[in-house]
Amino acid sequence: MDYYLFAARSVTHAQRMARLLSDAGISAKIRCAGAAITERGCGYTLEIPRRHAARAMQACRAGGVLPVKVLFVSDDGMQEVAL
């Protein structure tokens, strides 16, 4: 299954993004992220279904709460994508 991870710098940042997405009708799972994703040790990500990624990014931009990094995850691995 392909999905996107929106990286957040803190749990509060992740919760704010999740609230914006929920208000836009997009469900997202908040997960703890390791140093490989955040490059800063502990952090959080929101798992976004591939079909909702563009709309999720628009909702975050409109709400002024952007992810610090966006990663695309597929069977082939994980790669960072442009915001």
Language-model features, listed with the residues they occupy:
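C-terminal structural segments of small proteins and small subunits
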Residues: 50-83
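Amphipathic, hydrophobic secondary-structure cores in small proteins
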Residues: 2-5, 9-55
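Short, low-complexity, intrinsically disordered N-terminal peptides in bacterial proteins
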Residues: 1-2, 83
